[in-house]
Amino acid sequence: MITEIDASLLEKIADLTGKPVGAFNIRKDGGCEARQSTEHIAIDPQPEGKSGIIIRIKDGTKGEQCHIPVIISKSGVTEIVYNDFYVGENCDIDIVAGCGIHNSGCNESRHDGIHTFYIGKNSHVRYSEKHYGEGDGEGSRVMNPTTIVYLDEGASIQMETVQIRGIDSTVRKTKIVCGKGAEAVITERLLTHGKQHAESDMEIELNGEDARGRVISRSVAQDESKQIFHPVVVGNSKCFGHVQCDSIIMGKATIESIPAITANSTDAQLIHEAAIGKIAGDQLLKLQTLGLTEEEAEDTILKGFLA
């Protein structure tokens, strides 16, 4: 049964306001709340003894969506979930994930999601994942996502990961392996506040000729929170890779950004950029002259930066 709290979480992490259209799996408090397959997208449980789902998408599937949100509204729920995606050839689809935790108790609530994608030739996947935490209890809200992607020839993935707020601790690991002519774009947006801690390791391995990879990371660290980023692009053939990390630091926060590029081929073209700084005073002043308070001006700038 979906409660008001559950519905609010689903809207925040997956933009759902009712039953999803198409294939979906809604996981709640460690179990399956609802599931639906379609003619082209089959969702089945993992074999006994392993938590999670297997998603199989038929060759040529285009214009369909698959929603797989996770919500935890009970304090003390901890889980490790394995989701495996098998995307056929010549597909063009959207996969919407995300995890929301409401913890009003005194025990830790934790979700560790391990997603593995096998994307077939000339298929294009757009994958989005939002993380959000709330609740007035003393129990922490923890999320540790691991995402591994294998791209076949001519395939692509556009991955957007967003941490909205309220996650006390997160260790995020992402690895994408690109075949010939494949393309991977990772866009990460992250906000931490209070004494929260966030680590993000991202690696794109460009193995095939003419493979392309890009990492775009934007983050805001407020109060006494800490962020550590380690984006890596490895070029093993004629390829192009770009890493761009931009962060805004506020209060007594700490940010470490350690971008790395490795070329193992003379035909690899790799670029990395990283910047950390505070909000410019002239930006605040300009908005305040338009009638905004300093707090409202900061909020407006941060929303635009993370958009």
Regions found by a protein language model. Give the residues of each.
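C-terminal functional modules
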Residues: 1-25, 30
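Conserved beta-strand/loop scaffold segments within soluble protein domains that form the structured core
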Residues: 23-28, 33-285, 289-292, 302-307
